[in-house]
Amino acid sequence: MAIVKPFKAIRPAKDKVAFVASRSYQEYSKKELEAVLSFNPFSFLHIINPGYKFDKRVSGPKRFKLVYNRYLEFLEDNIFLKDAKDSFYLYEVKKDNFQCCGLFCATSVEDYQSNIIKKHEDTIRPREELFAHYLETVKFNAEPVLMTYKDDKTISKIIANERRNEPEYHFTTTDKVTHRLWVISETETVNQLETAFIKLKALYIADGHHRSASSNLLAQISKKNNPDHTGNEPYNRFMSYLIPESEIKIYEFNRMVKDLNGLTKKEFLIKLDGSFRIENKGNTLYKPTKKHHFSMYLDGEFYSLYLRKKVYRFTDALSKLDTQILFKTVLGPILNVQDLRNDKRIQYGYGKHNIIRMKDEVDQGNFAVGFSLVPITMNQIKAIANAGLTMPPKSTYIEPKLRSGLTIYEL
């Protein structure tokens, strides 16, 4: 039973929405960020970079307070407006050959605690605490947690009907992504959606594990500090974007390692031979085509690595993941990369055209070896989450990557 609720969103004025909604802060280069802040006074980036107003970089709790001040200024200047009715927000993204359509809504902290909302990544406690403090100070969610659910005919039919209507927003951003958003506030449709989601057994976090964990921590702190707690306070929920699992796009993260851990090329290949059947593919770009099959780039040549299944033990859903197999057979025992999150000798690059970058980095001598994997599937993610396990860091790069400031949930 997934509890999904409508909410009164704070959202951009219709004539400014294309200027307000921003990509994730980390996606901007320093040059891009400076350009947006200099020439676009409506960008949400002004809220999350509040020191720009004074030409001063601000961090920590001081920044949190200034973020809240900038948010209030956007409200005072009518850049942001508040909806009068609780609503769901249907949002469609189109780019190249990718398209998805889902719902902005308020999801339940109680569902997170009871594992109806399922996780597949570890979170870092200090980051949870820092972001919980941030949420407590700024009093809003602007970046939704991306979740997915098993395709459902009832939900799909409701969404299809709503998409026939004229959207509230329809705009294209400079990265050539087309955005459309519909406000669903009609009581009957809202109730139908709530009822349909209640019938779902689970929601799966695709992206935003720290955001959801921090919202859970904030709810615990707020409940403890509120003697009149009822369970209906806004802090008992957090903003999410829900899409059917058939519409999510998963890319791989390739791995590049700085050195061969003191081994020569021949010694390294001999050690690999214990776990893989190795074939030299020459200098033509070569990508793996199925699970348990890897592409390796070393010393100007590509190699295919086929796992020797008779020497590797499959014990659970985690052991079947290619990212885990590579860690257990190569990265850990041969290359001595034991901490996938913090070891400076390893770097990651997400799919699409990244195998070209991987080759270039090795050719330039920045890394000794690179490994390309096939993308993990949604079924594998669900198997990990259902078993209460967590995947190695950088196992998936997931689209859509959502814009900030399109809908805001006040806490």
Per-region residue spans from a language model:
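Surface-exposed, charge/polar-rich loops and edge strands
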Residues: 1-411
